[in-house]
């Protein structure tokens, strides 16, 4: 038989038995016998008590029978199928306790692996700070590392890579803030040190959008800075890729600094647009962001061709009209390897609608490069288990490459009911 998801090999047929090993996804094991043991959670809130005594390499122990599937003659065909991504965003220390210690992160990753998750997106760029000690930040006269992590003497990115790889996880650092600088009201953020990098609106004020103050993502110096951070991550750490959030964006009210307006005049021969939704002005900014996205893909793949350049944009049409994100264009022309649109909806009908709208402009062969971004809470409402499971089913039916859930803290909190239910829906 084959373990299709990460499962614990235990010394006894019990969830309290000593954990001998964590078997990564698709581990081949030899069945010795089926035994009755302590009960464990199964599907639909029920329980089972059937365990398999198995041999995995030189180790022998017990695995809950629920998490095994037949192998045999069809095993080679099964293993050749593209692996479904089952990802989880792990927020920064502002919203997650896993960064308190090496042991806390190890426990969190053990739980994820045991429940069948195979990819993590640890937050590493937030509120003007990097989680890792950054030579790029230091070179620009900025704090070398988030002071919380610096005081603790830890490098969360190195820990995530080291502990994640030990457990067979795909590790894709998440540069959450992108071209956003800091929350509105922050007293000593990035813009205090680099005021010339600010995105300006028509009144010459710093753009505030979504509760954040923004950098000018069309400023060549700002683009170079963020690009340097991305490359520092992929060059220094053994990651599987790097991911930008919906904040890899140009807010529609921004880009009114004189240098950007002058570049617009030279490129189009037109005066500054009277409206922020002017088609020519919007197209200029969309192309400016898309050019940076494409360039970063080229530079990342020069470091290592197998690295994944991933973006998690706001879904269409809002992402395009309000944030200048031509996300389906990025995927269709090969600028990115993976798209994780944030399809955060609180009903199945709304989810189906937004998914269809975002798949329609895509070439059908690109669908495996789309991973549905789902959330446990949308529009102020917690999602019901049945709703989330149906969204996962719809995503698979559409031929997507997997799902990613926002975020780790609510997923793994409490009784982990939803996390276990989602495991039962694995592809």
Task: Describe each PLM feature range.
Residues 115-152:
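Aromatic-lined carbohydrate-binding/catalytic grooves of carbohydrate-active enzymes
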